Every structure is written in structure tokens, then in C-alpha cells.
């Protein structure tokens, strides 16, 4: 991704409905993918609709890359906002081919994407061979890729994506996710991505907003926010951290790669990325155990020195969630309270983190 990330999104809204109130005040990056994450009913889609101008009753302020879309005296209607919107369902026109749907998107834009740029989007999303097909001739994943291309055809300054994979089965999600990762790398505009799926957030997001009961309870860089212990929602088995890492070495005999991050190196399964590839690793708290001294004669490949930062109760009276610092990187470990007591864990305690599984997610 290129371009200046300093041009930000200022979003402040208040909306009162019977039984629900949205009250948010956010400053978001002007580039990259911001995930709006939370349980159903937390206000994610309502916030997205306010940003799109679909909730006229919402009071507030919206500035996108220096442009005022809404304030006390001005309200730019949806059709005049330079944005693209991708819904859970592809919502393509059934009587038009994929090409016709893209051309429709270009016609409704005051400043449509240039033909050469549209060709780039078509290639990026891998839909060139699908352009002459009608929506009923496409799989769910193919329809959604065409819908994303149509949203980009209007040359938006902001792309809104409301759980674009929610209607797809697992196989179709795995089909579409690599294309979304390619968009993440190539797009020069901010993307707001609504999801309640931790794996999607781990793969795609740069910035994370945690929503609950109509409010933004946390907002910050993905890695830092996931490692917070004070989030109002628990991710259950999915709690963990995401770390930026680089493929530093390869062990072809055992089909492994060594990932360098700001805290050391980790062995992971080789997925074919070249040396120097910048990606992400995801480490779940359930896959981290602790010891007071190095352990030998174990099947665990990754053991790193760490320092205890803090700990909190973890939803069940038997469990505790421990935050660690490995070099400059955060790490989470889920332990039984009995184990934490036996290890005499306290802030500042030096331990060894044994990491049973490392997943490359980008």
C-alpha cells in the first residue's frame, strides 16, 4: 500500500432507538483496513450505515480525508458520497452480466474508475473469465468478488464492507480471503470492515475497533488491541495475538520456515512464502504454556524468554489469562489458576513461553 496514512476519518455519531443507542467518537486511519468487531447487536452495521449516510436520524460529524460529509449544518446524501459498499449478500443485478454490473457501477459515479484501473481491479480479484456470466451462473464466492469489483468501480474514497463473507460456507470463504488480502496490499483508500470472525480480523485488519452495546470500547492498532486484557468481550478459544513477522529462513528438510519478529524467531509450517516475505503470525493463548526454567526433551519447537505484565480472570473460575512481553511484542497465555499459583506469577516475573502452535495468516 502506498500513499499518506495521515489523512484520517473522524466519525462521531449519536443515534437513539427504542432499546438501543449508538454513541461513538472515533478517529480512524485514513488508509488500511479498520475492522469493526463485536457480537451481533453491538452496533457495527449501524455505525457503518451512519457513515454511509443511510441513517438520517443520526447526529454527529463525519470527515473523510479532509472532506466534510456530515456536521451540524451539512449532510451529504448517500448517492453523493464517494464510497463503495459491499453487503453480506452480493446484491448483483440478476438481469446483467458481471461486466454489466461493473459498468453500472461506473455509470453511477461522478468520477468513475478509468478503464485501465478497472482492468487492474478485475485482475486483482481474478474475475476476468467471469465477466460474461450472469449472477446465477456464479458461485457465492465469485458473486461476492464481482460485488467488490463493482464497489471499486465507482472510484470510492472509502470502502465499506459489511460482513462480506458471512453468507459464504467455509470453502467459499477460503476462496475469497486471498483476494481480500491482495486488496489490502494494493488499495490506496481506507476500508471499514465489519466482522465478528476473529480469523478474518487477524488476516485482514490493520486497526481494530471493538464494539459493544452501541459503543466503541477500544480502538487501536490490531496487535496492541488484541493483547489488551480490559476488553469488554471475551474471544473464548480465539483469544490471542497477531504479530508482524518476516520469513527469515527455511528448513526444506522439515518443511518449516523461521519467522523473525520484534521479540525473537518462531518456527512455523512452510506455506511457500519467499524469504523476506512480510506477513503475520497468529498465536492463540490456549497454545502457550509457561515454565520458570528452560525445558528440554520436548516436542515444542518454540520457546522464548518472556516477562509477565499482568493477568486477569478468564471467564471460568479455574482459568487465568496472562499477558507477557517477549522483547517488544505482546503475548497471551491461558493457564489454570493452579498453574499460575505454582509458578508464582506476578508482574515482572521472568518466565519461558512454550508456544505449541504458530499460524501464518498473511
Curated annotation (Swiss-Prot):
It is found in: Cell inner membrane. GO terms for cellular component: plasma membrane. It is a peripheral membrane protein. The lineage of its organism: Bacteria, Pseudomonadati, Pseudomonadota, Betaproteobacteria, Nitrosomonadales. Belongs to the ABC transporter superfamily. Molybdate importer (TC 3.A.1.8) family. It comes from Thiobacillus denitrificans (strain ATCC 25259 / T1). The gene is modC. It catalyses: molybdate(out) + ATP + H2O = molybdate(in) + ADP + phosphate + H(+). Pfam families: ABC_tran (PF00005), TOBE (PF03459). Part of the ABC transporter complex ModABC involved in molybdenum import. Responsible for energy coupling to the transport system. It is an enzyme of class 7 (translocase). Keywords: ATP-binding, Cell inner membrane, Cell membrane, Membrane, Molybdenum, Nucleotide-binding, Translocase, Transport. Its EC number is 7.3.2.5. GO terms for molecular function: ABC-type molybdate transporter activity; ATP binding; ATP hydrolysis activity. Transmembrane segments: none annotated. Its main location: membrane. The complex is composed of two ATP-binding proteins (ModC), two transmembrane proteins (ModB) and a solute-binding protein (ModA). Residues 297-362 form the Mop domain. The keyword Transmembrane does not apply. Residues 4-238 form the ABC transporter domain. This is Molybdenum import ATP-binding protein ModC. The keyword Transport applies. NCBIfam families: modC_ABC. ATP binds at residues 38-45.
Amino acid at each position: 500500500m502506498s500513499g499518506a496514512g495521515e489523512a484520517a476519518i473522524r466519525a462521531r455519531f449519536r443515534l437513539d432507538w427504542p432499546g438501543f443507542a449508538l454513541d461513538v467518537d472515533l478517529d480512524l486511519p485514513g488508509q488500511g483496513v479498520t475492522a469493526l468487531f463485536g457480537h451481533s447487536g453491538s452496533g457495527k452495521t449501524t455505525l457503518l450505515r451512519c457513515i454511509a449516510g443511510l441513517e438520517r436520524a443520526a447526529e454527529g460529524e463525519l470527515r473523510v480525508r479532509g472532506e466534510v460529509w456530515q456536521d451540524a449544518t451539512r449532510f451529504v446524501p448517500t448517492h453523493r458520497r464517494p464510497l463503495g459498499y459491499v453487503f453480506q449478500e452480493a446484491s448483483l443485478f440478476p438481469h446483467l452480466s458481471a461486466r454489466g454490473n461493473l459498468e453500472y457501477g461506473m455509470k453511477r459515479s461522478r468520477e468513475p474508475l478509468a478503464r485501465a484501473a478497472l482492468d487492474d481491479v478485475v485482475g486483482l480479484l481474478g474475475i476476468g473469465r467471469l465477466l460474461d456470466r450472469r449472477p446465477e451462473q456464479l458461485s457465492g464466492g465469485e458473486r461476492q468478488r464481482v460485488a467488490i469489483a463493482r464497489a471499486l468501480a465507482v472510484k470510492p474514497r472509502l470502502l465499506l464492507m459489511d460482513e462480506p463473507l458471512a453468507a459464504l460456507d467455509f470453502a467459499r470463504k477460503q476462496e475469497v480471503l486471498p483476494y481480500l488480502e491482495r486488496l489490502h496490499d494494493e488499495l490506496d483508500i481506507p476500508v471499514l470492515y465489519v466482522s465478528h470472525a476473529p480469523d478474518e480480523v487477524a488476516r485482514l485488519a490493520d486497526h481494530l475497533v471493538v464494539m459493544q452495546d452501541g459503543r466503541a470500547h477500544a480502538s487501536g492498532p490490531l496487535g496492541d488491541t488484541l493483547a489488551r486484557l480490559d476488553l469488554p468481550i471475551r474471544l473464548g478459544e480465539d483469544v490471542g495475538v497477531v504479530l508482524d513477522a518476516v520469513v527469515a529462513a527455511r528448513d526444506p528438510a522439515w518443511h518449516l520456515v523461521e519467522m523473525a519478529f520484534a521479540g525473537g524467531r518462531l518456527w512455523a509450517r512452510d506455506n511457500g512464502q519467499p524469504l523476506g516475505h512480510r506477513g503475520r503470525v497468529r498465536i492463540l493463548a490456549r497454545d502457550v504454556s509457561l515454565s520458570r526454567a528452560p525445558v528440554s526433551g520436548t516436542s515444542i519447537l518454540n520457546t522464548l524468554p518472556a516477562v509477565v505484565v499482568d493477568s486477569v480472570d478468564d471467564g471460568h473460575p479455574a482459568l487465568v489469562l496472562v499477558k507477557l512481553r517477549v522483547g517488544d511484542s505482546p503475548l497471551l497465555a491461558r493457564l489454570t489458576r493452579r498453574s499460575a499459583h505454582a509458578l508464582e506469577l506476578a508482574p515482572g516475573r521472568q518466565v519461558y513461553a512454550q508456544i505449541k502452535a504458530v499460524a501464518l495468516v498473511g
